[in-house]
Amino acid sequence: MTVIDDRDMMGAESSELSEAGARDYFELLKPRVMSLVVFTAFAGLVLAPGEINPILGLIAILCIAVGAGASGALNMWYDADIDAVMTRTAKRPIPSGRIAPREALAFGLTLSAFSVVILGLAVNWFSAGLLAFTIFFYAVVYTMWLKRSTPQNIVIGGAAGAFPPMLGWACVTGGVSLDSVILFLIIFLWTPAHFWALALFKMRDYGAVGIPMMPNVAGERSTKNQMIVYAVLTAAAAVAPFFTGLASAGYGIFAAVLSAIFVYCSFDVRRMPEGDEKMLPAKKMFAYSVLYLFAIFSGLLADHFAPALKAVISGVL
């Protein structure tokens, strides 16, 4: 079955909506995704060498959050046709008829411009340009092109979700470095294993709307094998901050243990029989992958603040 191309499939009801509530517009921002963006951007800002005025740092994080939300709104606007068909997304504001498509588009474009301009004026134009590119990459390159045209959609499009720590870093330094690239790679390499785990137990949904996710195109076996490869690469990237001097040996051990579990989960998915109705290993992999990424960046932050905390405790004692 192919994706419905008619942008007006919602009918007249979608274009003649009653006033939408603030909660509906907030949902357009994809708050769960935005929380991860904010957290990893904050990590990049804190881990970057140098200092930034706390007020400017707060403005930077808010602008990155708004930019992420804007790209989420644009994604929901464009994907309203397939969201209406998939059970996982059918209750989103546009397909459920709570917000008109044109209102979502205007909302996303306004927030995009606002976040980029304010970040440029308040912090620096390099980070603003990188934010603009991130929004464009997610809303246009991934959503409008890659998502519906290639099973590599998540692999390439995952770059959009990997930019936040680099954005936070750029807000402090005005540029990028090897360490910021490593932070980018942790998320970039993590994305395929994370999303393909979801795609495995949502194959029917993606197949119903014609989205060429890897399990639907290459099959379960090939997808599972590739998940192992990306899990191993993610593990290597996760321990890399220790080798570059960005983090201590304590973090290196912590990341290695978490990464070993991540890789084990990918092998557990590989052992799952094809056509398994419950797909419990894939669901566990998906759930753990979220905790894993939060834990890795939490570990980096804890490692960064550990010396200062130790000094404070020593002073008190």
Swiss-Prot record:
Transmembrane segments: 33-53, 54-74, 117-137, 154-174, 181-201, 242-262, 285-305
Enzyme class: transferase
Classification via InterPro entries: Protohaem_IX_farnesylTrfase (IPR006369), UbiA_prenyltransferase (IPR000537), UbiA_prenylTrfase_CS (IPR030470), UbiA_sf (IPR044878)
PROSITE patterns, per the entry: UBIA
Record GO cellular component, one term: plasma membrane
Reactions the enzyme catalyzes: heme b + (2E,6E)-farnesyl diphosphate + H2O = Fe(II)-heme o + diphosphate
Biological process (GO), any one: heme O biosynthetic process
Membrane topology listed for this record: Multi-pass membrane protein
Domain of life: Bacteria
PANTHER family listed in its UniProt record: 4-HYDROXYBENZOATE SOLANESYLTRANSFERASE, PROTOHEME IX FARNESYLTRANSFERASE, MITOCHONDRIAL
Family the entry assigns: Belongs to the UbiA prenyltransferase family. Protoheme IX farnesyltransferase subfamily.
Protein name: Protoheme IX farnesyltransferase
Source organism of the structure: Agrobacterium fabrum (strain C58 / ATCC 33970) (Agrobacterium tumefaciens (strain C58))
Gene: ctaB
